[in-house]
């Protein structure tokens, strides 16, 4: 029996339930409470906010836990790669006495004091918090202020966040740019961008459940970035099915010839810094296209 793809994509494009939104709000509130209860962290300039699909309202039920960023605003790590000769001194930054390592350890203590030792697991990049009594399922990311300088001026930078995994290295992220660009894309496509993101995410999850291995390496955020890349005119079809097919077709045909970026338009979508590659994406897109045509 063939699938009614128009009705299926209409259903899959809908936002997650109000329960899912409440889940994100509750997680944010409980993480803030944990920080406010910490004698050390409560005195510091810290921002707590959701990021990723829950904030963007593109999450689907099968997405991972709520992603909560805990950012220490007074600690800064800068990327000067675009401005040869730029350094901390020219940026008017001083060596901090309170380090990222101390911050992450203090956050771990605060979370365990709030949710219990068994409710908090320390990962390489984030804390996995599962506390049934508080109804919290969240990935809590300890971050500091990240800056990307574009000119030799202490105020000439793009602000983001930065994390330092336990395994080493530095990762810059751009949550505000992700959010604002996603909002603008949704407006420019007549509110169709987020609909199609959710539809294709659920298509990916459906394929994974059916045993298609090509769907499994494709995370939620990558799907969102891919749909963002598609030009606005490909969202103007007269049906959900047409718009989904337009996006898949465009991405498959253009992926080899393009240096694409994430939604933030700062970080390259492909490269050694990412956990995915173009071959995996092409295989997924081909699987998705073939599945729609054959069913």
UniProtKB/Swiss-Prot annotation:
The keyword Transit peptide does not apply. It catalyses: 2 UTP = c-di-UMP + 2 diphosphate; UTP + CTP = cyclic CMP-UMP + 2 diphosphate. UTP donor binds at residues 53, 59, 201, 220. A motif (Pyrimidine specificity motif (R/Q)xW in donor pocket) lies at residues 274-276. Mg(2+) 1 binds at residue 67. Keywords: Antiviral defense, Magnesium, Metal-binding, Nucleotide metabolism, Nucleotide-binding, Nucleotidyltransferase, Transferase. Pfam families: NTP_transf_2. The record marks 173 as: Important for uracil base recognition in acceptor pocket. Residues 1-25 are annotated as: Disordered. Cyclic nucleotide synthase (second messenger synthase) of a CBASS antivirus system. CBASS (cyclic oligonucleotide-based antiphage signaling system) provides immunity against bacteriophage. The CD-NTase protein synthesizes cyclic nucleotides in response to infection; these serve as specific second messenger signals. The signals activate a diverse range of effectors, leading to bacterial cell death and thus abortive phage infection. A type I-B(UU) CBASS system. Cyclic dinucleotide synthase that catalyzes the synthesis of 3',3'-cyclic UMP-UMP (c-di-UMP) as the major product, and of 3',3'-cyclic CMP-UMP as a minor product, which are second messengers for cell signal transduction. Belongs to the CD-NTase family. E02 subfamily. This is Cyclic dipyrimidine nucleotide synthase CdnE. It comes from Legionella pneumophila. The gene is cdnE02.
